Amino acid sequence: MRIGYGFDSHEFRAGIPLKIGGVELPHAKGLGGHSDGDVLLHAITDALLGAIAAPDIGVLFPPSDPKWKGADSAVFLREALDRVARSGYRVSNIDSSLILAAPKIGPHSADIRGRVAKLLGIDCSCVGLKAKTPEGLNLENAAVAHVVVLLEQTSLSTKIPASPKVREKRGTRTGNNAGPIKNKKKR
């Protein structure tokens, strides 16, 4: 099992649609960002990437790259899921918290959970979503998302990195000291 944590925040801006969890919500302002500004999908993506120790969303999809201007955040999520699968894991469940003053998420919660579940390929009962108001935190013009994801191995045949002692017995190392271990002469 692996656990990942993701966080994202965006400022509200006039003249753009509001997307949260892949669902367009009725609101006077949307969330600014280089892509579509979907704060929840961005946090989920980073949680998935973090769980497998992969580079974060900003490294894989840099805001400096015009290719990602206005991109659907589901593209980022699909790439993260592909990396998770290639690492031998799948999503077991996620839990998320949204912090924003408006709009109220309650009326849209089922739609958001359903869309996220579909994107992740899991049952809706495995997607937790809570919405909180910022109450005195001066966040009336922003939205924040926190996400925790639990991954499980897809099969027992998935390779798990050996412990340092096992690698030493095999005569190999990983990380900064990668390469074969030279036999030490006994004195």
Which residues fall in each region the model found?
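C-terminal edge-of-domain segments
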Residues: 137-156
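Short acidic capping loops at alpha-helix termini that bridge into adjacent secondary structure
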Residues: 123-126
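Short, small-residue-enriched loops and turns at beta-alpha junctions
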Residues: 102-104, 134-137
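A structural signal for short, well-ordered beta-strand segments
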Residues: 96-100, 129, 145-149
